[in-house]
């Protein structure tokens, strides 16, 4: 915060014990930092008390849900990972005044959460005595298909996409839709450089095509943007000269 950053504390997406409930209450009652609520229990703790962010795991897919949250104090919402540009345009047209929109723009997508830790299980250890072995797998454990293609990444309690969601080429469309904030999920290396590339495109000092070319060697796997274009999530699409879409072959 001293460096001019807006610090946001996130609540857990999966509450499964009294200790988790205690942590939830501590985070939502911190009294200093903005809180991102990632389930409706957190929303209940925050409603009417302080402005908050509705995280992507609140699963806000329609205008009635977004409008219901507005008087409770939501100041920003993060769209679900599967939401595409066409659906977002509908919600943006009826977005409550004063509510910002944030889009997950880069990173492996968190697709599901489990009460069990996959990394601990992989090492034949219980979750409560995991010895923090996830440190040995900073970008998670890659799961491949029988055809030896990257399919998912297991990272602690998260199941993530093997490919990296990348909306850097789509920044102009994000801006035209009135998106206020882009979310970049950190990786074990090169995150600072990736943020700088996005910053350059947003500020207009870099073209999207040049920045995307510089981004490729910094990514831990091939990219994808299918969800954004209303296609299967693992696919990559780009605009053609006629304003349509054409598929791009991405290899892991």
Pin down the residues of each PLM region.
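Active-site pocket-lining/capping segments in soluble small-molecule metabolic enzymes
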Residues: 1-60, 64, 78-252
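A cross-taxonomic marker for long C-terminal extensions/tails that follow the last structured domain
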Residues: 73-74
